[in-house]
Amino acid sequence: MNVMVSFNQLRNYFLESNSLRPSKWLFQSYGTSSSANILNGKLLARKLQRSVAEEVQALKAKDRNFKPALAIVQVGKREDSNVYVRMKEKAARLVGIDFKYCPFPETIQMPALLHELKKLNDDHTVHGVLVQLPLPKHLNERTVTESITPPKDVDGFGAFNIGLLAKNDATPIHYPCTPKGIMELLKDNKISVAGLNAVVLGRSDIVGNPISYLLRKDNATVTVCHSKTKDLIQHISNADLVIAALGKPEFVRGEWLKPGSVVVDVGINAVQRNGKRVLVGDVHFESASKVASSITPVPGGVGPMTVAMLMENIVNAAKIARTENIYRKIDLNPLELKKPVPSDIEIANSQEPKLISNLAKEMGIYDTELENYGNYKAKVNLAVYERLKHRKDGNYVVVSGITPTPFGEGKSTVVAGLVQAMGHLGKLGIACVRQPSQGPTFGVKGGAAGGGYAQFIPMDDFNLHMTGDIHAVTAANNLLVAALETRMFHENTQSDAALIKRLIPVKNGRRVIPRGLIGRWNRICASHNMDPEDVNNASPELLKEFVRLNVDPDTIECNRVLDVNDRFLRSIEVGKASTEKGHVRKTSFDISVASECMSILALSCDLNDMHSRLSRMVIANDKYGNAITAGDLGVSGALTVLLKDAIKPNLMQTLEGTPAFVHAGPFANISIGASSIIADKIALKLAGTESFDRPEDAGYVVTEAGFASDMGMEKFFNIKCRYSKLVPNTVVLVTTVKALKLHGGGPKLKPGAPIPEEYLVENLDLVKNGCSNMVKHIQNCHKFNIPVVVAINSYKTDSSKEHEIIREAALQAGAVDAVPSDHWAQGGKGAIELAKSVMTACDQSSNSKFRLLYDSETSIEDKVNVIAKEMYGANGVEFSSLAKERINTFIKQGFGNLPICMAKTQYSLSHNPEFRNVPKNFTVPIRDMRLNAGAGFIYPLAAEIQTIPGLPTAPAYLNIDICENGEIVGLS
């Protein structure tokens, strides 16, 4: 049977309307002598379509984002195809389905058409895709229709859906519309097919084959007849049920039928009768209706049912998409716990990660929003946020710690363990962490992927190149510095006329401002009340002002960067070659994560924001004290291009297969020491709730702030939250028994020496004394009106009495709870009690009470003072003359309202690393002030901060190697 049958059947429903009935067609009479029950598809179809319309209306009332949509692809302008498309459009709109018409010229070639279909497959706003047949002969219809993804194959003709239909123990996503309509029509008329001898006339993939599968599934005994079938009449005469779908007008005669049989006529044929065209079926209705017990008319039988089933399929497709989008469930990867706990790299290598595409699907991320980098890591497109921005954010948890010690308190381990524990409790937990620099990985610190059974994997990818974001930051930063140095060189070696000729070239008789310099040109023109379009009439003085930056070399703020610990780049000279004509300058390298470009990556809210921030970077002052920006240099567009992929968060996973966004890695000393705003925003929407969800359906986003509450957490709130407008529900403050003993007066640790016994045996006095440090950090959290849960990172050398001392001190200081957590040895199961306490704190929190330490309008000096007094417990701040001079410059340049990012030691609440526990009676000296205008903060220097570390005598790289099978060993 020709594939056009299905579209002809679609038409039948509409032929009942006089407004759509072609005048050239006549219709056969059903006759008055019929004894058969008429299976009226028109009435049932209307009932079903009303039901579909009511369901759509109800779902839209519950979820304003529920918008089922059908797209029809039409190639060429055949008039009959135009009629069918209009019919489907009308039917769709009647039940509340959006309609998208996609016409293409008859000349379109196969690759282009398949590309357009792929775009529809990838479009999450489209739920059903139909290709209007027939197609021009140069297009392969099967290839085209099979290219439609199964969830959107609402015709149900694709191999995937037909294949599942043919299997006894499987169910297709969508049933073919006409066969499905036949079964519904029989069911509505209380005709059970179980045990019947059913004969199907025709074996097309549109009706014959699929209806045979449906009948068989409903326990009929099915015979499929076709043009080669012998004794066809004999088969028909033995049939209890006849499905006629062979495309031959009035082929089946009444005398062939078994008395009392049921006849379903799928055919639609135009024949000449008395000089007029008449529509008839494949069954001779007049004779058949006298023998059959029930029969479908033509038109008004199967045709309207096809349309109704198509509408049902489209709505079902939209419901499936909605369910996949709303309901997220993470399947945990089981751990094989061992004692003693093996090395981190052994554990990481022994666990097979999930395919990242599968994890993304569990979270509700579409394939089209994922850019895979191999099997276990991927970038997530920022379009996810736009798609989900209507959601209420999930719960937001920030992990901080007490003052760090050489032991390491394990904040990253807590983050991993906590989200794994959320998974055990049936909650979606998403970690958001920084990408570690390769410098420390090969230096003294080692990796930063967590530890034990609470890690981020693959560990080697996490600690090394990942997706190349840090390399992109390195390239962008170094392009900026190279552009600045080169511009200085050219200004020193060329005349005004030569600079004007090269920077404002004449094309077709008109001077052209380069795209990257349009902003600078517009500002200069505005300051001179000149029309920026009138470039040709600009004065030589104005053109000179435009092309000459007049950089003061002594004020250059940006250094070249490298993601390697290399102490010998701390002070260098550039421009020593003879080709640079004496343009020699002392400078230095920083580590890549100390670059302002990295801070911008972390603090940008979207691509446009990143572009603006890169443009606002102040790279030097001119000789008159005015700020020179990357925008003045014309390089901000190129920097954005280099970072266009880096701005997309990286998706990885924990050992137990819970999701982790790993994105950005700004230096914690001179920057915010936190992962990106973008990662947090996307994660909060993925963990968020729809308007109809219950509050308890919300998931949890767990992120980390570098170092302790006085450093990373203070910057997290006063800088990151200020720009993101996001407010955490709870702080998790990490502490350990060993760290508190050190703060409580325990002996200092000496490099290479054994750990003193005090840290390995119970010592209640040291723990009690050290709790003062923890209490101060709890108080710091409360200054922002955020509840605190203390996580006691457990070790086998701890005693229950030591834990109880910590718990009592934490509760007395106002913590919601203090919970020992053994995630390092037990994975998520070891952190379940901690997770429960965090959930309780989130339920009880009201982040509307959140407050910042200072307003933007507060003076720079007062901002620094309030941080020192409130966070560190200092008596005050003492500014050097250089720092005061810098402050005046920043105010003059318009940067006085920026927040403060203090640069000091992490090893003390004070500026002095030797001052342990909770220092008293000290003043913080500020020797210098620096500006990161693009990132959006000023950083006072309260200590000498090395911005490029060196390598120790025995660096971590000594133990790192790769095996013949490609497995990396020695990472920690």
From Swiss-Prot:
Listed PANTHER family: C-1-TETRAHYDROFOLATE SYNTHASE, CYTOPLASMIC (PTHR48099:SF5), C-1-TETRAHYDROFOLATE SYNTHASE, CYTOPLASMIC-RELATED (PTHR48099)
Protein name as it appears in the record: C-1-tetrahydrofolate synthase, mitochondrial
Compartment(s) of residence: Mitochondrion
Taxonomic source organism: Schizosaccharomyces pombe (strain 972 / ATCC 24843)
Region listing for Formyltetrahydrofolate synthetase, in residue ranges: 341-972
Binding site for NADP(+): G202, R203, S204, S227
Domain notes: This trifunctional enzyme consists of two major domains: an N-terminal part containing the methylene-THF dehydrogenase and cyclohydrolase activities and a larger C-terminal part containing formyl-THF synthetase activity.
Reaction(s) this enzyme catalyzes, per UniProt: (6R)-5,10-methylene-5,6,7,8-tetrahydrofolate + NADP(+) = (6R)-5,10-methenyltetrahydrofolate + NADPH; (6R)-5,10-methenyltetrahydrofolate + H2O = (6R)-10-formyltetrahydrofolate + H(+); (6S)-5,6,7,8-tetrahydrofolate + formate + ATP = (6R)-10-formyltetrahydrofolate + ADP + phosphate
Task performed by this protein: Mitochondrial isozyme of C-1-tetrahydrofolate synthase. The trifunctional enzyme catalyzes the interconversion of the one-carbon derivatives of tetrahydrofolate (THF) between different oxidation states by the enzymatic activities 10-formyltetrahydrofolate synthetase, 5,lO-methenyltetrahydrofolate cyclohydrolase, and 5,lO-methylenetetrahydrofolate dehydrogenase.
Binding-site residues for ATP, renumbered to this chain: T405, P406, F407, G408, E409, G410, K411, S412
The keyword Plastid is annotated on this UniProt entry: no
Chief place of localization: mitochondrion
Keyword vocabulary terms for this entry: ATP-binding, Hydrolase, Ligase, Mitochondrion, Multifunctional enzyme, NADP, Nucleotide-binding, One-carbon metabolism, Oxidoreductase, Transit peptide
